[in-house]
């Protein structure tokens, strides 16, 4: 899987000056490569800081293995500038996935790389019939179809209004119960 995403035709629509567009190449999405952990960790640390390790979401990642078919990086001119990692979880008895972290280099945020990464995860999860759970900003993630998941019980304190779920088309029953890592 390698997707090439062109620079927007209307640079002003995404906050780019026209002279910036000539210097801004397209970006690609591809599977997370082996050996990229240091760069990915640097992106995530810059986005969330060291306090992220104390958050409830981290409990779902510790000792869990990423799902490589749903996790990806974004590259501009060969450099990793964005990342999304997805993990196997259960919500009650239902298999699901947990999205996070997602991080983009601040210099590249105007390219809508984060949006492309979220859409990639949702499209790939759709093909596998899997829901996607995350802890995040409802207005931002609501654009992609994420809704509150009031019956998903995470393994620690979290603002329940920020626990969101995306469901594949045709799947009407929102999973409920304790959220546990792994399948």
Describe each model-derived feature in a short phrase.
Residues 89-99, 109:
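A conserved beta-turn-beta hairpin within the catalytic core of GNAT-like acetyltransferases
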């Amino acid at each position: 899987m390698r997707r090439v995403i062109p620079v927007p035709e209307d640079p002003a629509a995404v906050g780019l000056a026209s002279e910036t567009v000539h210097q801004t190449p397209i970006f690609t999405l591809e599977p997370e490569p082996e050996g990229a952990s240091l760069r990915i960790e640097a992106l995530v640390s810059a986005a969330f800081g060291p306090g992220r390790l104390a958050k409830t979401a981290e409990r779902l990642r510790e000792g869990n293995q990423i799902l490589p078919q749903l996790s990806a990086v974004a590259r501009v001119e060969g450099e990793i500038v964005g990342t999304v990692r997805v993990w196997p979880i259960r919500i009650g008895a239902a298999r699901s996935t947990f999205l996070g972290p997602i991080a983009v280099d601040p210099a590249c945020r105007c390219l809508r790389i984060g949006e492309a990464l979220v859409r990639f995860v949702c499209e790939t999860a759709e093909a596998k019939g899997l829901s996607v759970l995350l802890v995040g900003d409802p207005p931002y993630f609501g654009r992609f179809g994420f809704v509150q998941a009031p019956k998903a019980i995470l393994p620690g304190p979290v603002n329940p209004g920020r626990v969101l779920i995306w469901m594949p088309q045709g799947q009407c029953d929102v999973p409920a119960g304790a959220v546990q890592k792994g399948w």
